[in-house]
Amino acid sequence: MAQILLHGTLHVTIYEVDNLQKEGGGHFFSKIKEHVEETIGFGKGTPAIYATVDLEKARVGRTRKIKNEPNNPRWYESFHIYCAHMASNVIFTVKDDNPIGATLIGRAYVPVEELLEGEEIDKWVEILDREMNPIAEGSKIHVKLQFFDVSRDPNWERGIRSSKYPGVPYTFFAQRTGCRVSLYQDAHVPDNFIPKIPLSGGKYYEPHRCWEDIFDAIINAKHLIYITGWSVYTEITLVRDSRRQKPGGDITLGELLKKKASEGVKVLMLVWDDRTSVGLLKKDGLMATHDQETEQFFQGTEVNCVLCPRNPDDGGSIVQSLQIGTMFTHHQKIVVVDSELPSGESEKRRILSFVGGIDLCDGRYDTPFHSLFRTLDTAHHDDFHQPNFPDGAITKGGPREPWHDIHSRLEGPIAWDVLFNFEQRWRKQGGKDVLVNFRELDDIIIPPSPVMHLDDSETWNVQLFRSIDEGAAFGFPETPEDAAKAGLVSGXDNIIDRSIQDAYIHAIRRAKNFIYIENQYFLGSSYDWQSDDIKVEDIGALHVIPKELALKIVSKIEAGERFTVYVVVPMWPEGIPESASVQAILDWQRRTMEMMYKHIVQALNAKGIEEDPRNYLTFFCIGNREVKKSGAYEPSETPEPDSDYIRAQEARRFMIYVHSKMMIVDDEYIIVGSANINQRSMDGARDSEIAMGAYQPHHLATREPARGQIHGFRMALWYEHLGMLDETFLHPESEECVSKVNRMADKYWDLYSSESLERDLPGHLLRYPIGVASEGDVTELPGAEHFPDTKARVLGTKSDYLPPILTT
């Protein structure tokens, strides 16, 4: 049967299976011993029956296990599934769970073509065995399905049409109005760095300074300071700009938090407990998180610092529990404090929150200059970060690894949602009940309330999103029905918040003109990768974001409209670039890019358009190269001969590490958070994540392009990366703009990768060093099989021993 594109939303309810019993009352399960799937088995106990929903080989839903109804398991579970899949059938698979793996009972098939009209289908479907014969007693599964094609969505390709836009549906947190958002590029921006960027209403864009604002927020807190991090390092200082000194600004973060706790402020910290401190990836030179040092630093003080492992929920198999506990992380980066009211008039306090990609740890402080060598005796002398060489050290000199990142400050009702997320996590894993009791502070801390009038042109609407499950958050509903009402997804006896992925999908589907992405990773939609040398069903990077982007571009090509997607990623994921894990991730990235380009090339060919697919989808990395100046820092040692380190030092170049997790749509909507574009971050049951999606209702791209704070922020980022601003940048979807940006990035790549260098690189944005062949295959650039100064393949290498769950 031919496969058909299902692009939209599929509502599915799985009710029950009848008659799992053979004639004469004998137990059905004795019949299926020979059909054991993926089972080592510890001896069978009570049958635990569950059902899954698959679109061909992509698993898109799973029920809980039913233990005491082996003959007639009843689930009555509903699923809200975002699809971007080619499929001929929606497949319902019924299995019996084992401690390791599961036993196949059978599969039921509903042809996709029955769904295309959008009618509700409610029926009993025959369950078949592997040979497509009915299983014993003609057992059936009762299901209900209804498909809503994306083109019927009132928001499809129409952007945010008014301030009445209610936010992303089916989520745990509702959208909040009357908020204020501050957007941060990098940990610090020096004075006078950003040129005049005009906004609507005769205003100009003003940059904010992340670590200075966090320093001020901590210093001024009187009741609470709550912090979560993948890493928190006590030895860093937050204020380092000699032109912008603050009283007490030279204090380390650890001493600052101890000082605040001694003043009676409740300081609570949840820091990821890195169980792989001795694990699989250690040899790849991945950065230590300092979790043990941080815990020891605060022992015996009034700071409550809890090392927090990524514990699985209780419902998984033995294998799943091992995977979650050792492979996945707590990745949220938040700070929540009490703060004075904006007017500063009364003694009352409010809640203020920070959310984004920047951990409060070493290696994160940087400015848009991203110097490799020139800050080694100043801002980075005591904070030298270079984990891409096995022996990177300040004593051996640069290049250090510069760090580009994005963060946000949230004020108004949205700040309380971030607080509630912290409280849920603390109640689950924090141990002692030492959270601030807000009832006792009723007369001091005001309840959630707007900080901006709704008719103020600078007001924001903001919504909080997460990837997290009940293994990491307290108080999730216990039944699938209640979970669905709360905007959560039920899995294998696990309740999951997967709203970050949902937010990306909704934003991409709404997009009208362009999308700008900065992310540390870019891989996914593995169900649509080419399967020449892999079994795609074994990869499991099933989130749909790359496929949604490709389908958006295709829909615009078919409609004869311009649309451009810009993606900025690091040259390679942090670590030794030749190592197996880094090479495996680059291989997944290449497959993801190739899947997207193949769709674009097919759409262009179908319309008879001869155009470079990079005019529709274009990938960049960022890097720097600096000539040597007199009086520069001189290291006392030299790196190993014939190493990546010495080659990079002599060529005076290195990548700028892109750690951002951001997407801007049409200059009107922005997502900022901790979540990467990979399965770990988007899954919900793997790494824990947090993000916010926001827009200014008075600055929408309805009749003319949006020119609010999001536009100003994007232009500031483009100025940082390109070293200049241009009129064409006002219309990123235009062929003039994408051609200019691609030309500049090509030129900067040539300068970056050339043998010699006359002067500093004029801009940082580099073409990602790949080519796109006529059929959409991703190829090496001539002479660029390896990244400069390394022996690491740009296109990556498939790993034969690292499990995909680790690298996707």
UniProtKB/Swiss-Prot annotation:
Class of enzymatic activity (EC top level): hydrolase
UniProt-listed GO biological process terms: phosphatidylcholine metabolic process; phospholipid catabolic process
C2 domain sequence ranges: 1-125
Residues engaged in binding a 1,2-diacyl-sn-glycero-3-phosphate: 331, 520, 659
Domain of life of the organism encoding this protein: Eukaryota
Residues binding Ca(2+): 186, 370, 404, 720
Cofactors that this protein relies on: Ca(2+)
Keywords assigned by UniProt, alphabetized: Calcium, Hydrolase, Lipid degradation, Lipid metabolism, Metal-binding, Repeat
InterPro entries, per the entry: C2_dom, C2_domain_sf, PLipase_D/transphosphatidylase, PLipase_D_C, PLipase_D_fam, PLipase_D_pln
Catalytic activity: a 1,2-diacyl-sn-glycero-3-phosphocholine + H2O = a 1,2-diacyl-sn-glycero-3-phosphate + choline + H(+)
NADP in keyword set: no
Active site: 331, 333, 338, 659, 661, 666
MF terms in GO: calcium ion binding; phospholipase D activity
GO CC aspect terms: plasma membrane
Its EC number(s): 3.1.4.4
Similarity section: Belongs to the phospholipase D family. C2-PLD subfamily.
Entry note about domains: C2 domain is a calcium-binding fold, and the binding promotes the protein association with membranes. A lower affinity toward calcium can be anticipated for PLD alpha due to the absence of two potential calcium ligands.
Record's protein name: Phospholipase D alpha 1
This protein's encoding gene: PLD1
